Amino acid sequence: MAKNKHNLESGSSIERSDERIKETQEVFTPPDLVDSMVNDIPEDVLKDPSSTFIDPSAGSGNFLVGLKTKLMEYHDEHHIVNNMLYAVEIMPDNHKELCVRLGVRSNHHHYVCADALEYDYSFGDPIGVEQYFN
């Protein structure tokens, strides 16, 4: 069972074989690409405490961890993880690692283990777009 090279670069502790990668089609965003993407977000968006960000295929959290790090330049950690970041991840082991890396409980309603193509995206609270899906 060979460990996937990309997994070694992602900082994940989950053992991912080449067979698993082939079966699940998991692709992880390398840290340098995460940094580039996060640095492309306009500063006024990062500074706005009402900004929200979702990763609908979060994996083990590379993008959200990088984004959280950047947001901590402007906001406290509690506000970021409870008001600004959201994630959906289908693989239970990835979801668990995502939550550990973000420092939240695995049952936190912003970070769900579900199929992003079927999830209702309410995250437990009405968000005002439900009227468009009836």
Task: List the model feature ranges, each with a label.
Residues 1-134:
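SAM-dependent methyltransferase catalytic region
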